[in-house]
Amino acid sequence: EDNDTTATTLIALTHSTLADFNEYLDVLAISDNMLHDWGYSGTYQLASFHPNYVFDGSDVDDAENYTNRSPYPLLHLIREADITRYMKKEEDAEKIFSHNIEKARTLGCPYFEGVLDTLKKDKPAR
């Protein structure tokens, strides 16, 4: 909070329970509520990424889900001021989202499955 040069923070959720997407969604909701309760609504925003991410209303096998899939469950804490500053440079914020979905569908699920599998295999040395 005191360092305004840090625009974003990634939080990796490593507990095995959170491999379940529904459990992860519970943690996401709790985290979002905590931000609100602590008075950070409008200051920070949570973006969510999970290996089994499925958008509400989307089919499990729709490639659009890969726009929010990651090798591991993550919470992405972002300063809203930075989002606002970036979005002022964009003509239409919705275009970004639509473009990402279109690109994901063009590349297809097998492409993203391969990328995520490669990333999971490439673990850092201990």
Residue ranges: model-predicted function:
Residues 1-126:
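Expand to "…catalyze enediolate/carbanion chemistry for C-C bond making/breaking, isomerization
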